[in-house]
């Protein structure tokens, strides 16, 4: 298995950046398109555990104003072969002292391209 296949890495890096832009713009249609539309998709958020694409989409519709604005740092994207990638990043939100963390597992589907199959967003405790 090739780690960080150049073409796959370029594709997923672009997809990750497009996801972040859609998140900051609260573009619900685009955000839905980034997730695998399956009951097996999972998203653990800061205050919610969402099982299945429908639950994730419903959460976004009900979220007033969308995601708090943030700045990313320490982003890492690693491809495992040409069809699996893990993206991790830290983020900083305005008026929040805790550092945010996000991890996403992306799979490239033959008919749909890259989709998030699992995501986790959390805020680090001030002390561990």
State each model region's role.
Residues 1-37, 126-128:
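Short, low-complexity N-terminal intrinsically disordered segments enriched in polar/charged residues
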Residues 3, 45-46:
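Second-shell loop/turn segments in exported
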Residues 15, 27-30, 59-60, 73, ...:
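Hydrophobic alpha-helical segments typical of transmembrane helices
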Residues 19, 31-32, 52, 56, ...:
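Hydrophobic pocket/interface hotspot
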Residues 35-36, 91-93, 120-123:
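Short beta-strand segments enriched in hydrophobic/aromatic residues
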Residues 46, 54-99:
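Surface-exposed, charged secondary-structure patches
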Residues 86, 99-128:
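Short beta-strand edge/turn micro-motifs at domain boundaries
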């Amino acid at each position: 298995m090739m780690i960080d296949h150049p073409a796959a890495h370029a594709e997923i890096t672009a997809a990750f950046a497009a996801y972040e832009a859609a998140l900051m713009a609260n573009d619900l249609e685009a955000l839905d398109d980034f997730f695998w539309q399956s009951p097996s998709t999972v998203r653990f958020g800061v205050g919610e555990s969402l099982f299945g694409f429908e639950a994730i989409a419903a959460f976004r519709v009900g979220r007033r104003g969308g995601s708090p604005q943030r700045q990313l740092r320490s982003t890492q994207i690693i491809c495992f072969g040409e069809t699996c990638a893990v993206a991790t990043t830290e983020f900083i939100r305005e008026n929040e002292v805790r550092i945010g963390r996000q991890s996403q597992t992306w799979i490239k589907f033959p008919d749909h391209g890259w989709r998030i199959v699992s995501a986790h967003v959390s805020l680090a405790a001030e002390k561990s």
